[in-house]
């Protein structure tokens, strides 16, 4: 809440605190729709992390529709359920968040291609400061973000953080090694990388590998392999 801010002068509030107060003032008007146009654009990373959890609570606890305008893939991944992407004034993609990201959201480019998976926290380890998030039939070990067991959680996995192997890796530091099958493969002649769409335990993830690796491993649609998720994070 903002109760502890009520007696503070506006000049003494941080950027994140000012945004929270502005949102609270808007909510006091009992709106039928909340429109936020780049609300975090002027904030640094730390201030964004201060206010994003608050926006998530608004999304989850209020019955008021929220229309959120942003150029940030991270903000979209954390807050959106349905996405409409514009480019030069035209709609170029729309639909559920997971589908739009999977089909290559125009704003993220190949380097930033990613998927968002919705799951539930099923384990937490105080010893290792990790948590297990189960999405579909797949369990992902990730850094603990403070969510309680049973809480819903979203995972974002970048394509560049997923490598593949034809045989099950042994003695590896990578904690998330998933049996998978290639269900899609795309690339452009003359480019050095290809994008694989993988099905792993009811989840679809992307893997960006070099064209040479794909050729030498004989990877094609239908190839069974192991996806090595080098990094996954609760968002």
Regions flagged by a language model, labelled:
Residues 1-5, 56-57:
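Conserved ABC ATPase "signature" region
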Residues 9-13, 17:
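Conserved ABC ATPase signature
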Residues 23:
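Hydrophobic anchor residue at the start of the ABC signature
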Residues 28-32:
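A short, proline-enriched helix->beta-strand linker immediately N-terminal to the Walker B motif
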Residues 34-38:
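Catalytic Walker B motif of ABC-type/P-loop ATPase nucleotide-binding domains
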Residues 56, 60, 70-136:
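Internal alpha/beta loop-helix hairpins
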Residues 139-186, 204, 208-235:
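Glycine/charge-rich catalytic "coupling/switch" loops of P-loop NTPases
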């Amino acid at each position: 809440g903002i109760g502890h801010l009520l007696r503070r002068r506006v000049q003494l509030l941080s950027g994140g605190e000012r945004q929270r107060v502005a949102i609270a003032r808007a909510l006091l008007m009992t709106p039928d729709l909340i429109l936020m146009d780049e609300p975090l654009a002027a904030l640094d990373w730390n201030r964004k992390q201060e206010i994003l959890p608050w926006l998530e609570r608004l999304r989850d606890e209020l019955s008021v529709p929220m229309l959120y305008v942003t150029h940030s893939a991270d903000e979209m991944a954390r807050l959106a359920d349905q996405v409409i992407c514009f480019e030069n004034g035209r709609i170029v993609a729309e639909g559920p968040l997971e589908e739009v990201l999977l089909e290559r959201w125009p704003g993220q480019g190949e380097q930033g291609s990613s998927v968002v998976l919705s799951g539930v926290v099923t384990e937490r380890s105080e010893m290792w400061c990790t948590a297990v998030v189960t999405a579909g039939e797949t369990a992902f070990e990730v850094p603990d973000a403070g969510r309680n067991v049973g809480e819903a959680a979203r995972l974002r996995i970048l394509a560049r953080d997923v490598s593949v192997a034809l045989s099950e890796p042994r003695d590896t530091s990578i904690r998330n090694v998933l049996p998978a099958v290639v269900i899609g493969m795309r690339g452009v002649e003359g480019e050095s990388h290809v994008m694989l769409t993988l099905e792993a335990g009811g989840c679809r993830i992307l893997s960006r590998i070099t064209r040479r690796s794909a050729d030498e491993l004989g990877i094609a649609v239908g190839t069974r392999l192991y996806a090595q998720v080098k990094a996954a994070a609760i968002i």
